[in-house]
């Protein structure tokens, strides 16, 4: 707060916010060096938003300062339950890989989620993705859980976004594997979520 007074701060965001911010950075006319800096800042902000430890420690750490837990932020007052999303992450990454291998195409979040959750949509059938070994492997996870895992994978760079331009001039984002995908797929890097 100001002048030593307490203050409240609220942050609300979702997966689409992450996608939109990454797209704005990628489509910016700025130099690649500047884009890298901006991607790093976005990743730091996402790490703060997804943190399960003291936010003050995280925030001051970003600026090179050390602190002890504040006892005042949401995480200190009500430590979030943390669950291991590694299995869900591996299922999502495997599906992205298998979809690209089977069809030579990349798809967006909704389609990948439909495959993982075993939804028999027209689009899933059209591309034969209901025949993939990963079809329905994540039916035990809620859509919210899988979106949280995907948001974390985007935040850590284990999943990338590729823009696809249509003839109409419209574009959409598809999910792609990155160099950061392999350690998660192999189980070398855990994916812990709140």
Question: How would you label these PLM feature ranges?
Answer:
Residues 1-145, 149, 169-193:
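C-terminal helicase lobe
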Residues 59, 154-167:
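A short, conserved structural fragment
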């Amino acid at each position: 707060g100001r002048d030593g007074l307490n203050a409240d701060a609220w942050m609300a965001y979702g997966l689409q916010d992450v996608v939109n911010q990454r797209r704005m950075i990628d489509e910016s006319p700025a130099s690649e060096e500047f884009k890298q800096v901006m991607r790093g800042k976005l990743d730091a902000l996402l790490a703060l938003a997804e943190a399960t430890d003291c936010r003050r420690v995280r925030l001051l750490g970003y600026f090179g300062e050390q602190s002890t837990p504040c006892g005042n932020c949401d995480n200190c007052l009500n430590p979030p339950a943390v669950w291991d999303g590694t299995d869900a992450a591996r299922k999502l990454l495997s599906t992205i890989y298998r979809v690209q291998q089977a069809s030579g195409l990349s798809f967006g979040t909704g389609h990948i989620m439909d495959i993982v959750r075993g939804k028999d949509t027209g689009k899933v059938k059209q591309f034969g993705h209901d025949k993939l070994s990963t079809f329905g492997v994540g039916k035990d996870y809620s859509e919210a859980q899988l979106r949280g895992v995907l948001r974390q994978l985007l935040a850590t760079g284990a999943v990338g976004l590729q823009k696809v331009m249509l003839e109409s001039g419209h574009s959409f984002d598809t999910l792609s594997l990155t160099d950061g995908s392999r350690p998660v797929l192999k189980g070398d890097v855990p994916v812990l979520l709140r």
